[in-house]
Amino acid sequence: MELSQLLNEIRANYEQLLTRNQIETVLSTRIQLEEDITKKMDKDGEALKAAQAELKEARRQCHHLQVEIESLHAVERGLENSLQASEQHYQMQLQDLESVIGRLERELQEVRRGIERQLREHEMLLNTKMRLEQEIATYRRLLEQEEIRYYGCIQGEKKEEKPTKSKVGFLLPSAIINEISFSTKVSQKYENENMETVTKQAVVNRDVKESAEAHGTIQTEKVDEVIKEWEGSFFKDNPRLRKKSVSLRFDLHLAATDEGCLESRQDNLPDIEVRLIMRRSCSIPSIKPPPGTN
């Protein structure tokens, strides 16, 4: 009785211990689970906060990027508009330049045609000038030949009448012809030989002109005598003139006559034309007459 009661008591205590242990185990397990859950919740909460902060930062960055993208789009649109405006502007300038180039090319062609036309006209004028110069030279040569033939015939006729006669005349400027007086002498030596020598000396305001010229046609064999006579007449007619203050130059050349005038004189020497030029020397002054003398 006592044993069964003891067993019952032991069984009851054991059951109580089991129940107590179970309860403690369950409680400890629950507490551990609650602690783990709490820790996990705390950790997850921190992670959630970090994720929320990251999300907020990402949203802020996304908004900033959106604003920047919009500004870039605006800049892009502005650049596109500026590009279109620049293209239109330069297209207009290009059209203007093309029109200017076309106009300048047309003007250049006109200038080239004008230059070619002027060159042709210049060539024509030059050819005309050359032809006119040739014609003028031809006419001048013909006139000189006719003049030489005419004077040759006249001189031939005079020489046939007075073959030993020589005439000399001075050529003076027309502007001072009214102020010039002449003195004339006839050489007795050549009068005896039937030869007349007319000497004219130019005197301006009682002084010999700076230059004077005489020419005449004489027989060839009388050249030396006539030249000496002419030279002496310059100083003989004006004693106040020194020979050192005057230089005399003699140019001799054959007188041109036509063939008809020379037919009758083939046996004689041809006449020559003598030209005497008197020039005052610049280094030696002449002696001027005292005032009041004639």
Swiss-Prot record:
GO terms for cellular component: intermediate filament. Keywords: Coiled coil, Intermediate filament, Keratin. InterPro entries: IF_conserved (IPR018039), IF_Keratin-like (IPR052857), IF_rod_dom (IPR039008), Keratin_I (IPR002957). Residues 1-150 form the IF rod domain. One of its GO terms (molecular function) is structural molecule activity. The keyword Cell cycle does not apply. Gene3D superfamilies: 1.20.5.170, Single helix bin (1.20.5.500). Residues 1-151 form a coiled coil. It holds the Pfam family Filament. PANTHER family: KERATIN-LIKE PROTEIN KRT222. Belongs to the intermediate filament family. This is Keratin-like protein KRT222. The lineage of its organism: Eukaryota, Metazoa, Chordata, Craniata, Vertebrata. The gene is Krt222.
